Amino acid sequence: MDIVEKAQMFAAGAHAGVGQKRKYTGEDYIHHPVAVAEIVRRSGGTDEMIAAAMLHDTIEDTQVTFDHIFNLFGDRVAEMVDALSNKAQPEDGNREARFFINVRALRERLDMQSRVIKLADLIHNTESITRHDQKFAAQYLAEKAFMLRVLFADAEIGVSDEEIESRPGAHPLLIEAEKIVATALAQLPEELFYKSDRINAALTEKWGSMQ
């Protein structure tokens, strides 16, 4: 069994073990990390990156710890999964406060390879949320548009230095993510579009005051 198969089996068991289902559809949660891993695979990701994509929500959402990932999959996979895991806790404040805690942690911890996984995660989540919950999408899309600017603008994204140096322009997944978010925003009813725009502006202003 290779590392990707092992990661998929482990993640499926971890998410099932806490009864986690995919929001809106009720399908087994593993469908999401499998979809994220497939996006990473088609983007040329290494086996370790694909395994980390399979595992990216295990520390955050299940009983799995960093040490479990480290012992079973090695330091590189564990490092990426940890970097991708939200750090904010419910007691850290309201949604905005927790959002900024997570953004700051992602900005500090993501590297070129884990940024690929984060973009894949954003793409798959955006497609699901805009399909099933337009009201929440106004909030969600504002946050993702903000994250695309803060986490990925001018950042290194890719499998290796060689790939980045040989690639003209932005990483294809960044282009895809920006297009998906922009298209989803354009498809919102006018009232929700302007609500999302106001949220984005407020996040940008608050972030600027925190720097």
Residue locations for each model-derived region?
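Active-site helical microenvironments for divalent-metal-assisted chemistry
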Residues: 1-211
